[in-house]
């Protein structure tokens, strides 16, 4: 009598042998994945360039575009693309934020979008979506935005932002900043929140070094790095409120300061850390600010656009540019110093978030549930 197990194995081997090698390999191959996808926008031509990297070189993808951050109800724009990029121009008169869906053959779709919002009067207004976390999830697009001052947003900008649906705006600026450059939010109903001035101003410490005798650019950069951790502590009440609103599901939410790189950058770094985004990605997001904004031109003017005498930043234009340069940077060293200080004093950045910002484990779970996919 034949052993039934041996007979079964023989049948399986025979069946496999009946298949061609190509068919077997096709059946066993894993579907391609999108390892990375990015979008850039040429504002002059209103042309988007979508680029991607697949897990299998040469894998074909389909592209579609949606007005929803989750990519739902997307409209196909191209199929079976074997290249790694595609350019697309919307029809004339079609405005609003766009999210692109990249779908590999038999694989899972990936949503991507421009990180910097194309606003006429925006300063560093950008989406925190698309970042991968250490546990394999992704920060959802269109839910949290970071920005600089919003006082120059145009009617067209507000029309664009109306489609984003922001429900809460947390303004980290001091009272004098808000009075000088007021935000007049008009992109739909939103809860605009401002905060009492901190007991001390970390920015004052950065500026004082400029007036020291024999000051050098290196001294200014060192002072910037040394004083940077104070931002997290002085802005703790504001950051705590931001986390509370996120935990309550009040999204989409935007937060801003003046430049959009220091107080907003620290807030973004704390939030991304709480979501489980790797440190190197958090630092890279922080460093993007100087890529998107020419801060020297913004705060001191240029030959084509000189700063007005009544500007609150007019005094900066009178200072040596080489000394101002470190203050205008989003140098990775600055936020890394913050992380190192918080780790030395609290054991970890997460301990700071939990103890000083008062974010509970239940709130963290709620925030992650809302903002990750």
Where are these regions (language model features)?
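Bacterial N-terminal signal peptides that target proteins for export
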Residues: 1-8
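Compact beta-sheet-dominated domain cores in extracellular/mature segments
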Residues: 9-13
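Residues at the beta-strand->loop junction immediately N-terminal to the Walker
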Residues: 256
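Ser/Thr-glycine-rich phosphate-binding loops at phosphate-binding pockets of nucleotides
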Residues: 259, 263-264
């Amino acid at each position: 009598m034949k052993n039934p197990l041996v007979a079964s194995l023989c049948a399986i081997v025979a069946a496999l042998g009946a298949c061609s090698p190509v068919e077997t390999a096709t059946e066993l191959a894993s579907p391609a994945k999108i390892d990375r996808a990015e979008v850039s926008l040429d504002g002059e031509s209103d042309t988007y360039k979508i680029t991607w990297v697949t897990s299998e070189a040469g894998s074909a993808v389909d592209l579609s575009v949606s007005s929803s951050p989750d990519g739902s109800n997307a409209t196909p724009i191209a199929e079976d693309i074997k290249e790694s990029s595609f350019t697309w121009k919307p029809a004339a008169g079609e405005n609003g934020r766009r999210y692109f869906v990249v779908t590999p053959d038999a694989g899972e779709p990936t949503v991507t979008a421009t990180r910097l919002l194309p606003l006429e009067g925006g300063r560093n207004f950008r989406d925190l979506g698309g970042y991968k976390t250490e546990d394999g999830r992704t920060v959802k697009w269109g839910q949290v935005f970071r920005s600089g001052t919003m006082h120059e947003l145009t009617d067209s900008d507000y029309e664009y932002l109306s489609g984003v649906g922001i429900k809460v705006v947390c303004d980290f600026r001091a009272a004098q900043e808000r009075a000088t450059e007021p935000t007049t939010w008009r992109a739909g109903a939103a809860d605009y929140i401002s905060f009492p001035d901190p007991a001390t101003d970390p920015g004052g410490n950065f500026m004082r070094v400029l007036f020291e005798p024999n000051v050098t650019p290196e001294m200014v950069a060192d002072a910037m790095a040394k004083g940077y951790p104070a931002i997290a502590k002085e802005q703790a009440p504001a950051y705590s409120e931001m986390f509370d609103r996120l935990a309550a599901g009040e999204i989409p939410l935007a937060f801003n300061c003046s430049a959009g790189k220091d107080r907003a950058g620290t807030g973004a770094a704390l939030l991304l850390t709480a979501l489980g985004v790797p440190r190197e990605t958090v630092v890279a997001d922080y460093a993007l600010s100087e890529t998107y904004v020419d801060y020297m031109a913004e705060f001191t003017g240029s030959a084509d656009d000189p700063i007005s005498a009544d500007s609150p930043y007019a005094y900066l234009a009178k200072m040596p540019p080489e000394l101002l340069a470190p203050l205008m940077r989003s140098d990775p060293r600055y936020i890394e110093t913050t992380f190192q200080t918080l780790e030395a004093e609290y054991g970890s950045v997460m301990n700071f978030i939990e103890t000083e910002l008062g974010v509970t484990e239940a709130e963290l779970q709620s925030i992650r549930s809302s903002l990750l996919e």
